[in-house]
């Protein structure tokens, strides 16, 4: 790749139909974990006009009122009137949940957490870069900020015409592999009929874009596409069917890193699609925070029923202060990559997952997001002797 290029990432709001589905799946997981930390949960959701379908495999001693929970999530997300695409108070909720297969259980559950086998085979990636304060790629970082601001203004009532469904996309210009300025911002937001297109355009620029995008990244040539199709009245599940796990690039690094293909939401941490990816981020972020590299990608892979990973790879894209092989050896010494130890060390058996389902699983330094800590950075730096 040329050192001078344009790179684009997108984010979506919590009212986007796919994100509504993710929230429902993770809310169900949280309610189960509150009662049963040893539950096995794989929960998928589909939302469409006037209905939500919840399906999957769950083995637990907990009891959850699925229908009530689903309706609450839909309403809390802002869908409290059929004119918005779905009404959480009156929508149909279909429950098609079954138990986890005994064949999987016998290979995964081993008694002690330390011996827990991976819930499935798979490969996961973690990534970090020193482009932004939270060590996330710039395009996804700013895309998330735009969507969080849209939600804030909608919920506060400051822009009362905003509705829950929205998307943002940011294109950054890189020079010598460093982000220099924003080339293009695309933002589409659902709205009610009371606002004109000019008023909407001006309000989005002034109250959303200018509030979160640093002035130094905007140039006279920066292009804006605000609701470029014109009217955006029909949104949410009415405009598009929503499904759990369809925003995996929004959930991670905006396309700036590889993705193993596995979604996160609705899965308990015995599923390495989730816990392995969280561990990958934890490792990569600590490597960059330690100054071992400016940019780092970590791959781990697992076999179903096996506690230890089958492979580990570190790639610093030529930015490492020591070799990638040396960093791999340090990772193996500092981080325990057994599935049960990941769950234990990152404290993943807590009801924290609905918070992860919007605005990215990575890059938000909330107390619950233990994989965002950089508590291993000094250990890595000392071991690397740099």
From Swiss-Prot:
Stretch list, region Flexible loop: 100-110
Q: Which reaction does it catalyse?
A: L-methionine + ATP + H2O = S-adenosyl-L-methionine + phosphate + diphosphate
Q: Which UniProt keywords apply?
A: ATP-binding, Cytoplasm, Magnesium, Metal-binding, Nucleotide-binding, One-carbon metabolism, Potassium, Transferase
Enzyme class, first EC level, given as a word: transferase
Q: Which superkingdom does the taxonomy of this entry point to?
A: Bacteria
Residues reported to bind ATP: 16, 165-167, 240, 246-247, 263, 267
Known pathway: Amino-acid biosynthesis; S-adenosyl-L-methionine biosynthesis; S-adenosyl-L-methionine from L-methionine: step 1/1
Positions with a binding annotation for K(+): 44
What are the annotated GO cellular component locations? cytoplasm
Name the residues that bind L-methionine.
57, 100, 240, 271
Q: Where in the cell is it found?
A: Cytoplasm
Q: How is the cofactor bound?
A: Binds 2 divalent ions per subunit.
Q: Which cofactor does it need?
A: Mg(2+); K(+)
Question: Which molecular function GO terms apply here?
Answer: ATP binding; magnesium ion binding; methionine adenosyltransferase activity
EC numbers for this chain: 2.5.1.6
Where does it mainly reside? cytoplasm
GO annotation, biological process: one-carbon metabolic process; S-adenosylmethionine biosynthetic process
Sequence positions that bind Mg(2+): 18
Cited Pfam families: S-AdoMet_synt_C, S-AdoMet_synt_M, S-AdoMet_synt_N
Q: Which residues form a coiled coil?
A: none
The record's family statement is: Belongs to the AdoMet synthase family.
Function, please?
Catalyzes the formation of S-adenosylmethionine (AdoMet) from methionine and ATP. The overall synthetic reaction is composed of two sequential steps, AdoMet formation and the subsequent tripolyphosphate hydrolysis which occurs prior to release of AdoMet from the enzyme.
Q: Describe the protein's quaternary organization and the partners it interacts with.
A: Homotetramer; dimer of dimers.
State the protein's name: S-adenosylmethionine synthase
């Amino acid at each position: 790749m040329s050192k001078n290029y344009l790179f684009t990432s997108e984010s979506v709001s919590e009212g986007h139909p796919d994100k509504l589905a993710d929230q429902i799946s993770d809310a169900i997981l949280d309610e189960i974990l509150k009662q049963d930390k040893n539950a096995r949960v794989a929960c998928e959701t589909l939302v469409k006009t006037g209905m939500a379908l919840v399906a999957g495999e769950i083995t637990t001693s907990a009891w959850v009122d699925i229908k009530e929970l689903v309706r609450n999530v839909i309403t809390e997300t802002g869908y409290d009137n059929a004119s918005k695409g779905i009404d959480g108070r009156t929508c149909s909720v279909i429950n098609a949940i079954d138990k986890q297969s005994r064949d999987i259980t016998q290979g995964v559950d081993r008694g002690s957490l330390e011996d827990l086998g991976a819930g499935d085979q798979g490969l996961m990636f973690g990534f970090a870069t020193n482009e932004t304060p939270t060590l996330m790629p710039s395009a996804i970082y700013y895309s998330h900020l735009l969507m969080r601001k849209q939600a804030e203004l909608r919920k506060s009532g400051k822009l009362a015409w905003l509705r829950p469904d929205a998307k943002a996309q940011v294109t950054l210009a890189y020079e010598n592999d460093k982000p220099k300025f924003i080339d293009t911002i695309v933002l589409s937001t659902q709205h009610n009929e009371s606002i004109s297109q000019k008023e909407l355009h001006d309000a989005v620029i002034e109250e959303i874009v200018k509030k979160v995008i640093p002035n130094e990244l905007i140039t006279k040539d920066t292009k804006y596409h605000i609701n470029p199709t014109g009217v955006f009245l029909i949104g949410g599940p009415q405009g598009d069917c929503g499904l759990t796990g369809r925003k995996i690039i929004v959930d991670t690094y905006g396309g700036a890193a590889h993705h193993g293909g596995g979604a996160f939401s609705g899965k308990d941490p015995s599923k390495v699609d989730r816990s392995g990816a969280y561990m990958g981020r934890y490792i990569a972020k600590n490597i960059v925070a330690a100054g071992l590299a400016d940019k780092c990608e970590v791959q781990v892979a697992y076999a179903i029923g096996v506690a230890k990973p089958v492979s580990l790879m570190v790639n610093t894209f030529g930015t490492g202060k020591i070799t990638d092989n040396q960093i791999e050896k340090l990772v193996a010494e500092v981080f325990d990559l057994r599935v049960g130890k990941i769950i234990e060390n990152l404290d993943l058996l807590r009801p924290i997952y609905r918070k992860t389902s919007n605005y990215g699983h990575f890059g938000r330094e909330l107390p619950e997001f233990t994989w965002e800590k950089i508590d291993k950075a000094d250990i890595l730096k000392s071991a690397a002797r740099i």
